[in-house]
Amino acid sequence: MTTLLALDTATEACSVALLHDGRVLSQYEVIPRLHAQRLLPMIQSLLAEAGIALSAVDALAFGRGPGAFTGVRIAVGVVQGLAFALERPVLAVSTLATIAQRAHREHGVDQVAVAIDARMDEVYWGCYRAQAGEMQLAGIEAVLPPEQVGLPRDSAGSWFAAGTGWRYAERLAVTPAATDATLLPHAEDLLRLAVHGWQRGEAVDADQAQPIYLRDNVATPKAPR
């Protein structure tokens, strides 16, 4: 039976989840700016709770973004380091999809419009529909001014709004049926999405674990020309 380890540090929340012997264990903390200090201890604690060594993990999943640049880089760095050391593949999972999956789990909704506060007067935006329990992207993920967001062209029925970007609901050009602007990504939901990806053969080598920022001017140094 597959053992998967998932982690997410793309927002204020830091979380890890483990699938082992068909059982899911997880830890979740909202700890802005403390992800780098807490992530590895949380992983070690979860492995100890499951009674397994890190070497028992078959693959690692991580929140690829979009989100806070530093947080996304922490997740990529830790996953690549562990995956290289263990010679295990990785699965990159969208932060927006993870929030949609959490909304599906906690609120029982099948259509979710996710908005994360992207600063600079923009939001990270994506719309998702449930297919056999998996929240799948309808359209594209984008970074946009709130006034430019929209539902998929084939949209029908009611949509649930999730994510911190919905704190600016009066500016977002979509009217949802209900809203939870407090939802942050949880590794338990990232893990669920990663399981679907694993079953489809989407795992890649560690050096292919790349962040998705959606914004070009990220806070990383550029090589001189």
Question: What does each of the following model-derived ranges do?
Answer:
Residues 1-64:
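N-terminal beta-alpha supersecondary unit
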Residues 180-212:
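Glycine-rich phosphate-binding/hydrolytic loop that grips phosphoryl groups
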Residues 46-50, 85, 103, 190-198:
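Stable alpha-helical structural segments in soluble proteins, enriched in small hydrophobic residues
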Residues 1, 200-204, 215, 220-225:
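SAM-dependent methyltransferases
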Residues 61-95:
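DPxDG-like acidic metal-binding loop motif
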Residues 21-24, 76-84, 130-133:
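A glycine- and small-aliphatic-rich helix-loop capping segment at beta-alpha/alpha-beta transitions
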Residues 23, 34, 89-185, 213, ...:
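Surface "functional belts" at beta-alpha junctions
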